Amino acid sequence: IDSETSRVIETEAEYIVNNPPLNILEYSCEYFGSSYEGRKEGTKKLLGITHKSPIVVEESRKIIFFPTTSAENEKCVWINLEKIDKYYKLDPKRTAIVFKNGDLIELDISYGSLTNQILRASRLKFLLDQRILKKENKI
């Protein structure tokens, strides 16, 4: 797949989209009433993360994606945190992810880097959950 095309893997389907991954993520943020830049800024304020930031695409359904490299890198893969079942090291620079639907992908990312990205996205989810609980208890 080239820099202008993406392979999208969903729970029940897989297809090719004639758009780069970042454009798809930007569209998804806009679809749910925000912007990619706004979501990125929100992550920065909550976590202090400025590079390879996880993004909340939609907060009520807890749709959080994280990148495997810089978002501008044409080899960047965006992963939905909630869809991961497990992951394991293939070699020092490659890791496999098994999704909850049984699909498996092999990525050019070290096990440590992927773990760090998952932890960042999980921390973002935790902070959002805490804010929602805090707000619900005040009402």
Protein language model features and the residues they cover:
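Eukaryotic intrinsically disordered, low-complexity regulatory linkers and tails enriched in Ser/Thr/Pro
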Residues: 1-79, 85-139
